[in-house]
């Protein structure tokens, strides 16, 4: 077996057997099955086995990945076999070799215990043998027989078992590697490489991977090698460098090493330079040459594809693209720099082990990724350098990165890779590098082998003395690449976000996206304004900037100034979209002239401006026209080759196509694709003539331009089809324009176009009701339908199943498939018949709005009969339905951005309508909702649009109601209740907070939220509940429909309704939740106001505007509160106690800031469920003794409770408290011992001016705030706080001495 990057073994399998029993029967069939699976098996070629085992055989065992031991009756009669077994057992223990025992007509227990017939034979063999040798045999027999294997007695026949053994071995050898699965973006690279390699082709193929150092070429190649190895009998992943100046000797040395590795033959000698071709010309090989910088190496090892057998693939990796060209490698994968969003994921994967940062590191991570640049190596290095560091250390590092304009700091980081790789390994406590959650990062690209590095980081003063980037005492543990090449920050030339970042860096002073203003954005837009495309540019940059981590409310692209600038730009330009129509004709061909006119008319009809551009007879190409268009329709005819000037223009157009986002749509007019591709017919004659009269390089550019056009595909003109073709071409152009601004359609088409499936392709599209799933599916269907033999689009599948039932729909489907004339019914057609009938036909099937997987299977007869060449697209509101329909990765349709919503509004509303921003907000990016709302407010008779919009929210258009109702009605009672609580009370709240409270109400909240997400009714954004406003409105409408009288509804949120219920004392047991915004409200409540609300679970009286107070008074006191309450949130509670009758047995959160309470209540209460208590700024509070009963408390907030003096008996002595905030408790003097509070992370005593004594610290504290206290000394236990990151001692004027702290704690704090 060839050597690879993951360790070299000469053989895949070593078989150990007794030739007396199995060589001609069982073994022969097994070897045949292994060979059929391309498994490299050692064969002894008739080696005599009655001699002592020789060194060659021992070497073969040690250099095999798997040993198959075939125990048979006479296996133990051979000392050779037994000695083999001892060696195999040794390799099993010491080299982790895989051993597969096979029991051929012998029972495993006989082998293990050496009994029965097997034991008799073994006993004879042992006679006269040394005891130590017999002992080794017995130990090996017992150990190997104890390994799970295959017993022929348990199988119906040999053939079945042999096939299973071969399959098992194949899986063990070629199991999919996890080394690369966690590398961000690797799948996209592998898909791109697969399309270049064309693995289905039997023709040998040589391709290149090019890109700068650190871009990830080697990592991509290693992942590719891991993925493709099972398909090749011989494979090798090698890196060679010149070590000898003598060309001939160096080449022989290269060949010897190369053939030794790929053929698995040690010390192989070659005599001439033709050995590679002679040895491999009939072999199917996979060869990857890494880090190539010598053209002679390529000529020597992979001179031509003809040197290798059919199906071979050779991949050459280099930084030098010209080296590939010089070796005639034209299929080159140029590794692109990652987008800003992908760069952030790469950085986070290294820093946090996941592709997104923790919430408190989000902004820091975004800026670090931005400052690291776009080179994957630098992103990984910096991420690993920051791995495990505390937030304060990140903040300290920022100035160095911001000032690192020349890359000196990053270069320093990259110079210590081996040192820090070992540090990280040690920090992970010896865990396996590939263990789940600890991604193995491959940063070895272009890393020279053989160097030896110290395990200690050199002194900063000695190694960084030439830079002022470090203080003398800094020790920076980092992982980096030893490469000394630093590539400047570059991205694709057509990457708008990169261009914007570059623009900011060139400002004076330099800026970054977090520090720029709206004026900076406008200045950038002025540099990029071309023919009205500025709006689309802003739309893309809004998406990129927010993917980069900028909050929408802080995004300068969304500012009023930028919006005003866009309006002014629209008023100045007012151009429609221009589409270029290229041709090369002399007006003598009537058909071509007529066709161009048909295209122009169709473009006008669709609202575009056609710019017809004849390349014939033009001296110069109009570059301004090129840059003013996003789509070019190119009519290719034989006239092109009659004009050298036209061909030069064609080259220029294709160069422009490669460097911009221009879309080219070729139309082959009276020429065939094969003529241009193979330069046949008139093209062949013309180019032969041009070859004779012109420079070769000019002709080669023309050929390259022709090849590039052919690679795009396009449409072929046929006589009589010009009008149909014109419509199809313009529809394609329109769709391509839409693609450039529609991330949804673009994403789906990218998935379809890169699909390499050898089986049926089943794609799923899911999203909320009204998001546009049907429209997108229809566009895809119309775009792809011409390429299929049979196409079927079944719209409104859910509705059709209700109207016709699945059986009738199946009859319709069968009749469409086979045609009415065949007279076949559903009962006549079995899946096997369907499979055979359509095996060689292509099928495109779209099922729109599927709500039940069983119905879908019933209509189409299951998914099993579909095969390669068949594509099924399903849309659904439910992700789980798509998964049940065998969709592997459902594509979620994203909501419209604000800019897309704005453009849609402008199609209906003229001028600056005052309600546009409210329309955009109320629609939540749902196209259906936005269209219906905009259409409604655009009617002329409406005088007050804002009032009309509010009425629409209370009574939405029928289509919105129907779309929502169907999703809601399909939920179970648990999910319905959770949804209504979220809609009425928890939209925008933390998911964990909602789960905490609603679980206490008896709901299965986490499961319910997951189901609501799958049903597209809610989503999570930064772990917060996100719900489209139309859905929230509908949820509240459902509650409103429970009863006309608010007192009989389950949930109340409207202040008017709530005040009516409370002041009239009309509450009933129907009410389960009340959330009242009491800003600017003043009212008196009765003592029995909650007397009949037995089922009230959630109660919240609050003020949403700062400066206001909740003025709900209880002049006659309060008799009771409902015992079902899990949330009691009452700001400015007016009484000194809670009702004595109140039993808080279900209470989870007590939130009563700014209350008048002196104590909660008299006596003890059951506080088992209480998790959070907030009594902040309750200035009269003196007694919290009852909290000692709350053993599950996690958060206590008593900030500003200025009357609290002694809490020594009040803090619960349990290990569940996480935070204790007693800031500004100015009379507090001491705290109890905290040694048992093992989960306490935060202690805040700042502003406790009389606080003097602290006995000890909780052992796992991370944050301690003691600013402004009167403490005189700190307890010695502070030295043991290994998790401490913040220690605030500001203005501790009485502090006399402080224990000496470990260096680690000082550095963290």
Curated annotation (Swiss-Prot):
Pfam family for this entry, one: LRR_3
Domain NB-ARC as annotated: residue spans: 187-418, 755-987
GO molecular function, one term: ADP binding
Disulfide cysteine pairs (residue numbers): none
SMART domains assigned to the protein according to its UniProt record, in alphabetical order: AAA, TIR
Coiled coil (UniProt feature): 1114-1141
Location of the TIR domain: 9-173, 574-737
Keywords: ATP-binding, Coiled coil, Hydrolase, Leucine-rich repeat, NAD, Nucleotide-binding, Plant defense, Repeat
Catalytic activity of the protein: NAD(+) + H2O = ADP-D-ribose + nicotinamide + H(+)
A GO BP annotation: defense response
Residues at the catalytic site: 84
LRR repeat locations: 1145-1167, 1168-1195, 1214-1237, 1238-1258, 1259-1283, 1285-1307
Family to which the UniProt record says this protein belongs: Belongs to the disease resistance TIR-NB-LRR family.
Domain notes: The TIR domain mediates NAD(+) hydrolase (NADase) activity. Self-association of TIR domains is required for NADase activity.
Protein name as it appears in the record: Disease resistance protein RPP2A
């Amino acid at each position: 077996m060839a050597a690879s990057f993951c360790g070299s073994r000469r053989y895949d399998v070593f078989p150990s057997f007794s030739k007396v029993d199995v060589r001609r029967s069982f073994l022969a069939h097994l070897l045949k099955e292994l060979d059929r699976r391309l498994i490299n098996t050692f064969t002894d070629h008739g080696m005599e086995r009655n001699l002592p085992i020789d060194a060659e055989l021992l070497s073969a065992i040690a250099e095999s990945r798997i040993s198959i031991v075939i125990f048979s009756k006479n296996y133990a009669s051979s000392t050779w076999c037994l000695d083999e077994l001892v060696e195999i057992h040794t390799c099993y223990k010491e080299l982790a070799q895989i051993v597969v025992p096979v029991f051929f007509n012998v029972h495993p227990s006989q082998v293990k215990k050496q009994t029965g017939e097997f034991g008799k034979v073994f006993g004879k063999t042992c006679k006269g043998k040394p005891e130590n040798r017999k002992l080794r045999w017995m130990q090996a027999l017992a150990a190997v027989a104890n390994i799970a294997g295959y017993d022929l007695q348990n199988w119906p026949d040999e053939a079945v078992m042999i096939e299973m053994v071969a399959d098992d071995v194949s899986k063990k050898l070629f199991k999919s590697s996890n080394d690369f699965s966690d590398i961000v973006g690797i799948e996209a690279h592998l898909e791109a490489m697969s399309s270049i390699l064309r693995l289905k082709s039997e023709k040998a193929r040589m391709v290149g991977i090019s890109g700068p150092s650190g871009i990830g070429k080697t990592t991509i190649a290693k992942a590719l090698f891991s993925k493709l190895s099972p398909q090749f009998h011989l494979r090798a992943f090698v890196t060679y460098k010149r070590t000898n100046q003598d060309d001939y000797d160096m080449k022989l040395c290269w060949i010897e090493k190369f053939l030794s590795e790929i053929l698995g033959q040690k010390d192989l000698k070659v005599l001439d330079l033709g050995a590679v071709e002679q040895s491999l010309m009939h072999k199917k090989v996979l060869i990857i040459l890494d880090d190539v910088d010598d053209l002679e190496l390529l000529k020597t090892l992979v001179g031509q594809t003809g040197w290798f057998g059919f199906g071979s693939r050779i991949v050459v990796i280099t930084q030098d693209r010209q080296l590939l060209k010089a070796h005639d490698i034209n299929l080159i994968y140029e590794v692109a720099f990652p987008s800003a969003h992908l760069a952030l994921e790469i950085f986070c994967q290294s820093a946090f082990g996941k592709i997104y940062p923790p919430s408190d590191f989000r902004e820091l991570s975004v800026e670090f990724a931005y400052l690291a640049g776009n080179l994957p190596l630098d992103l990984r290095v910096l991420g690993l350098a920051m791995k495990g560091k505390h937030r304060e250390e990140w903040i300290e590092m920022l100035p160095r990165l911001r000032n690192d304009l020349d890359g000196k700091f990053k270069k320093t980081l990259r110079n210590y890779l081996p040192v820090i790789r070992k540090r990280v390994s040690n920090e992970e406590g010896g865990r396996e590098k590939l263990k789940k959650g600890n991604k193995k990062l491959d940063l070895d690209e272009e890393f020279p082998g053989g160097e030896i590095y110290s395990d200690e980081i050199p002194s900063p003063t000695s190694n960084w003395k030439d830079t002022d980037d470090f203080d003398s005492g800094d020790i920076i543990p980092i992982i980096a690449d030893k490469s000394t090449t630093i590539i400047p920050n570059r991205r694709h030339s057509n990457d708008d976000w990169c261009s914007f970042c570059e623009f900011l860096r060139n400002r004076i002073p330099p800026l970054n996206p977090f520090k720029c203003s709206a004026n900076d954005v406008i200045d950038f837009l002025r540099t990029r304004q071309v023919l009205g495309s500025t709006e689309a540019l802003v739309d893309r940059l809004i998406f990129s900037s927010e993917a980069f981590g900028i909050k929408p409310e802080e995004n300068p692209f969304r500012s009023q100034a930028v919006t005003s600038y866009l309006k002014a730009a629209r008023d100045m330009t007012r151009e429609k979209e221009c589409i270029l129509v290229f041709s090369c004709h002399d007006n003598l061909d009537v058909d071509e002239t007529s066709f161009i006119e048909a295209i122009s008319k169709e473009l006008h009809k669709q609202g575009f401006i056609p710019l017809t551009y004849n390349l014939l007879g033009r001296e110069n190409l109009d570059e301004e026209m090129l840059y003013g268009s996003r789509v070019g329709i190119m009519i290719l005819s034989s006239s092109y080759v009659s004009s050298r000037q036209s061909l030069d223009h064609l080259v220029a157009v294709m160069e422009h196509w490669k460097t911009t986002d221009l879309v080219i749509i070729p139309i082959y007019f009276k020429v065939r694709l094969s003529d241009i591709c193979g330069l046949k017919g008139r093209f062949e004659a013309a180019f032969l003539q041009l070859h004779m009269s012109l420079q070769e390089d000019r002709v080669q550019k023309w050929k390259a331009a022709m090849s590039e056009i052919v690679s795009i595909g396009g449409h072929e003109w046929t006589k009589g089809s010009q009008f149909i073709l014109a419509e199809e071409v313009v529809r394609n152009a329109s769709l391509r324009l839409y693609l450039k601004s529609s991330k949804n359609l673009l994403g789906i088409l990218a998935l379809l176009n890169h699909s390499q499936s050898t089986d049926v392709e089943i794609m799923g599209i899911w999203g909320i009701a009204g998001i546009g799933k049907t429209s997108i599916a229809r566009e895809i269907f119309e775009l792809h339908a011409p390429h299929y033999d049979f196409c079927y689009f079944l719209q409104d599948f859910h509705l059709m199943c209700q109207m016709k039932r699945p059986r009738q729909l199946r009859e319709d489907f069968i009749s469409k498939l086979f045609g009415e004339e065949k007279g076949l019914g559903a009962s006549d057609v079995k899946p096997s018949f369907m499979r055979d009938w359509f095996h060689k036909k292509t099928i495109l099937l779209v099922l729109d709005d599927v709500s039940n997987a069983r119905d879908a299977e019933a209509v189409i007869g299951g998914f099993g009969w579909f095969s390669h060449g068949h594509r099924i697209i399903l849309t659904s509101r439910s992700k789980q339905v798509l998964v049940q329909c065998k969709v592997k990765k459902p594509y979620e349709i994203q909501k419209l951005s604000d800019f897309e919503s704005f453009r849609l509004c402008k199609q209906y509303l003229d001028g600056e309508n005052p309600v546009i921003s409210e329309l955009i907000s109320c629609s939540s990016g749902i196209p259906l909702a936005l269209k219906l709302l905009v259409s409604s407010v655009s009617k002329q008779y409406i005088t007050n649009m804002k009032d009309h919009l509010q009425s629409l929210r209370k009574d939405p258009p029928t289509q919105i109601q129907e779309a929502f109702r169907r999703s809601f009605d399909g939920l179970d009672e648990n999910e319905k209740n959770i949804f209504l609580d979220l809609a009425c009370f928890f939209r925008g709240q933390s998911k964990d907070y909602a789960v905490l409270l609603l679980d206490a109400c008896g709901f299965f909240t986490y499961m319910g939220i997951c189901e609501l997400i799958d049903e597209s009714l809610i989503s999570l954004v930064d772990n917060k509940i996100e719900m489209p406003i139309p859905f929230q409105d509908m949820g509240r409408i459902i509650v409103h429909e429970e009863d006309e009288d608010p007192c009989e509804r389950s949930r109340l949120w409207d202040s008017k309704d709530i005040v009516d219920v409370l002041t009239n004392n009309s509450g009933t047991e129907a009410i389960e939740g009340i959330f009242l915004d009491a800003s600017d409200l003043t009212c008196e409540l009765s003592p029995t106001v909650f007397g009949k609300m037995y089922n009230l679970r959630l109660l919240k009286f609050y003020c949403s505007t700062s400066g206001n107070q909740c003025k709900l008074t209880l002049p006659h006191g309060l008799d009771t509160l409902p015992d079902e309450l899990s949330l009691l949130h009452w700001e400015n509670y007016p009484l000194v106690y809670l009702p004595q009758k109140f039993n808080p047995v279900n209470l989870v959160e007590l939130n009563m800031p700014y209350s008048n309470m002196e104590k909660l209540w008299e006596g003890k209460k059951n506080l088992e469920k209480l998790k959070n208590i907030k009594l902040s700024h309750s200035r009269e509070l003196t007694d919290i003794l009852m909290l000692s009963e709350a053993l599950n408390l996690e958060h206590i907030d008593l900030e500003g409770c200025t009357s609290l003096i002694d809490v020594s008996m009040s803090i619960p002595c349990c290990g569940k408290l996480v935070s204790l905030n007693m800031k500004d408790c100015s009379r507090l003097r001491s705290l109890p011992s905290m040694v048992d509070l093992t989960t306490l992370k935060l202690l805040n005593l700042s502003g406790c001016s009389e606080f003097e004594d602290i006995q000890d610290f909780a052992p796992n504290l991370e944050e301690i705030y003691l600013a402004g206290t009167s403490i005189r000394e700190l307890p010695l236990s502070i030295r043991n706080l290994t998790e401490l990151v913040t220690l605030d001692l500001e203005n501790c004027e009485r502090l006399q001495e402080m224990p000496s702290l470990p260096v680690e704690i000082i550095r963290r704090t």
